[in-house]
Amino acid sequence: RRQRQMCIRDRRIVFKGVNRHEFSSKTGRAVTREEVLKDIVTMKQNNINAIRTCHYPDASIIYDLCDEYGLYMIAENNLESHGSWDAAMHGSVPKDTIVPGDNMDWEPMMLDRVNSCYQRDKNHPAVLIWSVGNESYGGKVIFDMSEKFRALDPYRLVHYEGIFNDRRYEATSDMESQMYTSVENVKKFLAEHKEKPFIMCEYTHAMGNSCGAMHKYTDLTDTEPRYQGGFIWDYIDQSILKKDRYGKDFQAYGGDFLERPTDYNFSGNGICYGGDRDPSPKMQEVKFNYQNISILFEKEGKFTVVNKNLFANTDRFRCVAVLQKNGVVVKKQEIETTVPPLSTKDYEIPFAILRADDKDQKKDPDAEYTLTVSFRLKEDMSWADAGHEVAFGQKIYKKIPAFHASEKPIRVVHGKVNICLLYTSPSPRDMRR
């Protein structure tokens, strides 16, 4: 660790990760090699660089594929006792009933699990961090589990989030790890606690039409050096293949089996669909926020390339600038870029019509011009063909008409599941004022 940061070859790492359960809609927890390979390839294509195995060691094939394709891993031990400590936190049972807590009767079995986790996966270079387990509060037994990992492997870091609820054994985790903390509270914690690097082991819960505010977290990696990314909850919808009354297959969730009570579709919180394991629309947001090259349009007549890759120069990629008018491509040009890792460089916008000093061409004042600068693979890779887009930035050039606000107040209406804003649009006569 350098300056309380996690580093690889002395370069600060940012985890652009996902939590991934072992799940198939056809075979349950027994996932095939083909399904795992599709997951890995999809992750690589969408700029995901890390997996947290939640909340148990996965089948060995995924460790092999992460080694081969180049994904980092938090390898998690098989432990979660959510029910025991959750009840204690709410006061319904005494805290001394928490498992494993400080009950040393549990320690031999827990240390055996740690040893098994380590011995099986110790030779996988993809594994950067060992995780003691998930959501099991704190206590002496869990601290001893972390110490067992360190005794077995003095080179890797140890992770555990549960000390967030029990600070008696802070040394259990080598990093501060939290779940679903707001951006403002992350900033507040970093300002007040400077002892460790910080990750979100679970964040941007991907249920329903979600991930829209994800950038508020990923932007933090640029402004808070000790904030080093997070792991989306979670990767794939946990749905089960079922036939409807017409014999047609569909992906079923809670309640589709006539069971009550149920959590309904609460297990459908992935960025990939169950079944075919294809990306859902949420993946577009993930890919953009996780991209390792940023393109900014903050300087007149120029665009800025920010290379966030730890080891790759931008000359490994084709840089293509595309000019569109009202959605129709009118010009396209390749640009040679050479931006070293963790560096920034400005380039001239190649289309004169978009520059303020353009004297030869006149923009159509009513048209919308769009400049898109993208970076694409030059060569075929094991996970994508040449031409696959790894990053892009875009700016829209359009004259925006003045907005005429209503003079009448906006009324807020609170429904059972929605909040509505009601207002009266200004009349044409009002707009002429």
PLM region spans:
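Terminal connector regions
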Residues: 357-401
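Acidic glycine/proline-rich low-complexity segments
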Residues: 178, 218-220, 232-233, 237, ...
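Low-complexity, Pro/Ser/Thr- and charge-rich linker/hinge segments at domain boundaries
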Residues: 2-5, 9-12, 393-414
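Solvent-exposed loop and beta-edge segments used for protein-protein assembly and interaction
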Residues: 313-315, 341-343, 363-367, 387, ...
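Extended substrate-binding grooves/exosites of carbohydrate-active enzymes
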Residues: 2-5, 9-300, 304, 308-315, ...
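Hydrophobic residues positioned within well-ordered beta-strands of beta-sheet architectures
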Residues: 301-303, 319, 347-349, 371, ...
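Single conserved hydrophobic/aromatic residue that forms the stacking wall/gate
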Residues: 3-4, 8, 423-432
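Intrinsically disordered, low-complexity Pro/Gly/Ser/Thr-rich segments with frequent PxxP/GP/PP motifs
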Residues: 328-364
